[in-house]
Amino acid sequence: MGQSKKLNKQPSSLSPLVQLAGIRKCFDGKEVISQLDLTINNGEFLTLLGPSGCGKTTVLRLIAGLETVDSGRIMLDNEDITHVPAENRYVNTVFQSYALFPHMTVFENVAFGLRMQKTPAAEITPRVMEALRMVQLETFAQRKPHQLSGGQQQRVAIARAVVNKPRLLLLDESLSALDYKLRKQMQNELKALQRKLGITFVFVTHDQEEALTMSDRIVVMRDGRIEQDGTPREIYEEPKNLFVAGFIGEINMFNATVIERLDEQRVRANVEGRECNIYVNFAVEPGQKLHVLLRPEDLRVEEINDDNHAEGLIGYVRERNYKGMTLESVVELENGKMVMVSEFFNEDDPDFDHSLDQKMAINWVESWEVVLADEEHK
């Protein structure tokens, strides 16, 4: 986090595929999407991320043509498709339930869309088998859906969508029904498939780890509005507000009060009772309240024994959780605030496995912090 780390930027040459402008949608008089503007670029994997009820699935359904907008415009390849029926858009959707036909074979499920479009019979078999090869299911063509695992069913649903050669593939929480291990595997497979196909993917999820793993770009939503739009690294390391910071991964939020500005970048502040320098890229005044945000992995801890003195925030270990590669400790500061610290496991370090109630000093690399204005005391 913070200013010393460079962010991976999306190539500036990406061309827009979908443009949503001034989109508004209400259900039963309640506004669920409010003046939303969003551009989706050719060939990217974009994730709409947010809690239940934030409007992300509604946006997906509006793009697909499964819902109609109350106001605003939807453009696909510079063509206005706002009022074009779903079946006439070059868009396919993979739903959470997969919606496979149980009485049809895998081959027939994938071929269904082509038959509905009256595709010449000679084209159907090669196109279906090509789609099944892409998802590594060509040997399963004659099986029925009930003879497949959850992951295989999901791949059939994707093959059925891509066989139509859509410009855009929409995926609505399509991994949420899978168990943890299979979900992790499918995250990698989906991203690899998207690269291979070159089709633009728009993926909807409430799972932030899923979004960080797969996406070229993440759009974080709340209450029908976009809170932040950026690369996974930007969203994780440079959250624009407290909602995004708290929604994406674990984060520690320290209260701070400005003492004085030292230079263009640094401010002297009181952070949870300790005076230190923090990097602040906006105007502040003495006495102003701030939030200093640090991820658990960005904190450094040192045991304090009777014979040594350490600088930093002072606290005591209250919980330890061994996570294989990391040790997560909960440290209670002297003012009662709980702080999460994550350290890479080092069995050769005699001080690594901290005892409960061990006195600790917490520090961080200057400039790794993200500083936000206190939204309640602006």
From Swiss-Prot:
Gene3D superfamilies: 2.40.50.100, P-loop containing nucleotide triphosphate hydrolases. ATP binds at G50, P51, S52, G53, C54, G55, K56, T57. Its EC number is 7.6.2.11. Keywords: ATP-binding, Cell inner membrane, Cell membrane, Membrane, Nucleotide-binding, Translocase, Transport. One of its GO terms (molecular function) is ATP binding. It catalyses: ATP + H2O + polyamine-[polyamine-binding protein]Side 1 = ADP + phosphate + polyamineSide 2 + [polyamine-binding protein]Side 1. Pfam families: ABC_tran (PF00005), TOBE_2 (PF08402). It is an enzyme of class 7 (translocase). It comes from the Bacteria. It is a peripheral membrane protein. Residues 18-248 form the ABC transporter domain. InterPro entries: AAA+_ATPase, ABC_SmlMolc_Importer, ABC_transporter-like_ATP-bd, ABC_transporter-like_CS, Mo/tungstate-bd_C_term_dom, P-loop_NTPase, PotA-like, PotA_ATP-bd. Its main location: membrane. GO terms for cellular component: ATP-binding cassette (ABC) transporter complex. It is found in: Cell inner membrane. The complex is composed of two ATP-binding proteins (PotA), two transmembrane proteins (PotB and PotC) and a solute-binding protein (PotD). Part of the ABC transporter complex PotABCD involved in spermidine/putrescine import. Responsible for energy coupling to the transport system. Belongs to the ABC transporter superfamily. Spermidine/putrescine importer (TC 3.A.1.11.1) family. This is Spermidine/putrescine import ATP-binding protein PotA. It comes from Shigella dysenteriae serotype 1 (strain Sd197).
